[in-house]
């Protein structure tokens, strides 16, 4: 029922979506709303110069999920299942009655909160959108650069009911869907790029868009910013919209949190780690950085040259942990939109308590949970508390710095590693450009075939679940 309702809403805004974004992607513009059926046609792609057969998933829209990036060696041989089993072998933590460990922070929260699906909000992060509203109450943050080197934040809330104003909200990018997919979240945004549309349209994503014609309007515009930096919502309105759309509100019984947390009160001080009292992400426009306080044990955030503050309560954003993921990023052909190969593996940093250590990350597919491991291949156990996850493009590693203060920093990777990673990204970019046209053309063909199969109508128009 919920999916029929959801698909009907997409039909109402077909004209807007076609005119607002799909011009950037001509091969998908032929039919922006048809969705893949259970048939699995295959396509030829080039991987490192060799032809391989890859099948296109019915609802995953995940044709590249099994392709190994030739510029990145697989860094983890242990499967996600094995990692989960290893974590399960640890002594059970004694959790107070009526409480559960939060899947976002590892802290104890009431069961009705911890068992509920979180909501991820896409937050505008340009200077004209500062200061934000409500996001100091988020439990997890995911930051990534979008087009023209601007950054955007995905603020994930477990307890959002009483937050009166959340925003400013901005549009979705496809890689943010992948970065948050393992959280079993409901995804809230205000519009989307053309490349995100097929994923949002799939049954794998429950989303709330400020540009949709819903029976209940959960979004509003308010000061102090001018449009498009003034779109907001509230916890109460989001709850009502979720009920209206009939989305599942609780985690399913087999849900496994994607992060492994240490026991409450058992902190890892990362002995022997690199000094990391100051962390500069190296993003060129908002210049985000974090400073560690030994008194609070938290990293306070700064950007645009001043404290990053929530205007609703005056609180500066602060987190216990910072995780850096080094990823390959290229632009879609003939556009300025970025594409990250999120379903891959790579290196990164785990930063907490004023120290930093090397880690690895991996995702098996576009929608898979992320797996973090220590340098020796063990599951990474994160200190309880809020975490800031930042994706660092490999060609910008030289700008990301860690040290004791803003004057005494070093690049997150040595010069030799930076040079090697920059060479890898060149090879990866060339490889991706080889297969992109074939990939997008095949996706358009499948969508058009589905239209013909349903008598000239899209799945949206015939109301299929």
Model-found features: residue ranges?
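Intrinsically disordered, low-complexity regulatory segments
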Residues: 30, 220-221, 439, 443
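Bacterial N-terminal signal peptides
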Residues: 16-24
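A surface/extracellular/periplasmic glyco- and lipid-processing/surface-interacting theme
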Residues: 67, 77-142, 147-427
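Sec-dependent signal peptide cleavage junction
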Residues: 24-41
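Bacterial Sec-dependent N-terminal signal peptides
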Residues: 1-17
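Ser/Thr/Pro/Gly-rich low-complexity, intrinsically disordered segments
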Residues: 42-43, 71
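Ser/Thr/Gly/Pro-rich low-complexity, disordered linker/stalk segments of secreted
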Residues: 48-91, 417-434, 438-442, 446-450, ...
